[in-house]
Amino acid sequence: MQSLHLELTAGVDEAGRGPLAGPVVAAAVILDPSRPIDGLNDSKQLSAKRRDRLFDLIIERAAAYCIAEASVEEIDRLNILQATMLAMQRAIAGLSVTPQLVLIDGNRSPLLPMRSEAIVKGDARVTSIGAASILAKVHRDRLCAKLHETFPLYGFAVHKGYGTADHLAALVQHGACPEHRRTFSPVRAALARAAAHA
C-alpha cells in the first residue's frame, strides 16, 4: 500500500557542455524499483566498457527513459546553458510516463511543468540521476564516434570534442567543421590563428 504514495521521480543529467564540438545531450530516467540495477554511479567514475553494459541494462529495466539533444546551431544561438536546459526539457517531455518530481544534476533546473530540484553532485548521490548520466554520456560518446567517421581530421573519437592540444592544432590546420561551436572562445581563437596564417 505504501508504494501508492511514492512519487514518480525522474533523474536528469547532461553530457557535453564543455566540448568545442557536437550537440549537448540530456537524458531523463524513471527507474523501476522492482528491477534494480547495481553500479549506477556517476558515469565519469566508470570505465567505458562498464558504462556500455549499464547503458543496455538501464534501457532494458527502466520504467521510462528519454535521450534528447540540443544542436550546435542551438548552442551557438542560445548559449550553452540555455541549450542544456532545452535538451533537459526535451528529455523530460519525451518520457512515456510523466514524473511528479524531477531531480536534476547540478545547481540549476530548467523551467518545467512539474516540481523539480537541482542537486549538486547528484550523479553520485541519486540513483536515477546516475542512470541518466550514463545514458547521456554513452549516447554522446557514440555520436562522437560517428562524427569522427564524417570528419576524421579532428580526432573526435579520441577527445570527444574537448579542447585538447591535438584538437586545437587540427582546428588551426583545417579550420572548423559544421559541428564546431563557433561561439566557444577556443574555436574562435583557433580560427583567428588559422586566418592569420592564411
Curated annotation (Swiss-Prot):
InterPro entries, per the entry: RNase_HII, RNase_HII/HIII, RNase_HII/HIII_dom, RNaseH-like_sf, RNaseH_sf
Superkingdom of source: Bacteria
Transmembrane segments: none
Nuclease as UniProt keyword: yes
Intracellular or extracellular location(s): Cytoplasm
Family matches, as CDD domains: RNase_HII_bacteria_HII_like
All residue ranges annotated as the RNase H type-2 domain in the record: 7-196
Reactions catalysed: Endonucleolytic cleavage to 5'-phosphomonoester
Broad enzyme group: hydrolase
SUPFAM superfamilies xrefs: Ribonuclease H-like (SSF53098)
Cited NCBIfam families: PRK00015.1-1 (NF000594), PRK00015.1-3 (NF000595), PRK00015.1-4 (NF000596)
UniProt function note: Endonuclease that specifically degrades the RNA of RNA-DNA hybrids.
Protein name: Ribonuclease HII 1
Originating organism: Methylibium petroleiphilum (strain ATCC BAA-1232 / LMG 22953 / PM1)
Taxonomic lineage from the root: Bacteria, Pseudomonadati, Pseudomonadota, Betaproteobacteria, Burkholderiales
